[in-house]
């Protein structure tokens, strides 16, 4: 399988007038279903939300443990019945691992929905995915989970992140969000 398929790309950088659109309408031209096209450095400088995955990414099991333990502690502090949240986090971590282990990729929209990011917020994530893919000693095929044995995820009606308005979240039932 040729690893050069993603390296030779036409220049699809956005002009400065393209960057003025609303975040919800922001779309990069797609050259790859998982991480889209290259963006200008200016796009990355303007985007602070996605800086949770800086280049170069490398495996860090201690960080993974610390991050998941923060979430478990948060669940315990915030909810009287945190069991369903613990199960949901464990299931999500396991599902992501198994999708990769089975040799499947996720498409850009799926990453954005799973990680609760808008297309603009996902720029750093997609740049890191592209970089990790180019450095990988074990290339994976271009088989996408939603195109094969799995059901594609429905487009979300919106994202909920630290910089988004979360009015009405208290009205949602735990069971409807977890299943």
From Swiss-Prot:
Disulfide pairings: none
InterPro entries reported in the protein's UniProt record: IE68 (IPR003403)
Tagged with keyword S-adenosyl-L-methionine: no
Composition skew (Basic and acidic residues), residue ranges: 1-12
Keywords, comma-separated and alphabetical: Early protein
A GO BP annotation: regulation of gene expression
Region (Disordered): 1-40
Family of the protein in this entry: Belongs to the herpesviridae ICP22 family.
Protein name: Transcriptional regulator ICP22 homolog
Lineage, highest ranks first: Viruses, Duplodnaviria, Heunggongvirae, Peploviricota, Herviviricetes
Gene name as annotated: MDV088
């Amino acid at each position: 399988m040729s690893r050069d398929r993603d390296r030779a790309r036409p220049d699809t950088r956005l002009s400065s007038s393209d960057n003025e659109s609303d975040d919800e309408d922001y779309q990069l031209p797609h050259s790859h279903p998982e991480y889209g096209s290259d963006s200008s450095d200016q796009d990355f400088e303007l985007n602070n939300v996605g800086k949770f995955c800086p280049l170069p990414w490398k495996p860090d099991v201690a960080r993974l443990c610390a991050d998941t333990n923060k979430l478990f502690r948060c669940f315990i502090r915030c909810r009287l019945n945190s069991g369903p949240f613990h199960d949901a986090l464990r299931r999500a971590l396991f599902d992501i691992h198994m999708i990769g282990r089975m040799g499947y990729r996720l498409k850009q929209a799926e990453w954005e929905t799973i990680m609760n990011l808008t297309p603009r917020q996902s720029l750093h994530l997609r740049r890191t995915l592209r970089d990790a893919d180019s450095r990988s000693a074990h290339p994976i095929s271009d088989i996408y989970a939603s195109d094969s044995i799995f059901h594609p995820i429905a487009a979300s009606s919106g994202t909920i992140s630290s910089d988004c308005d979360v009015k009405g979240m208290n009205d949602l039932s735990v069971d409807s969000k977890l299943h």
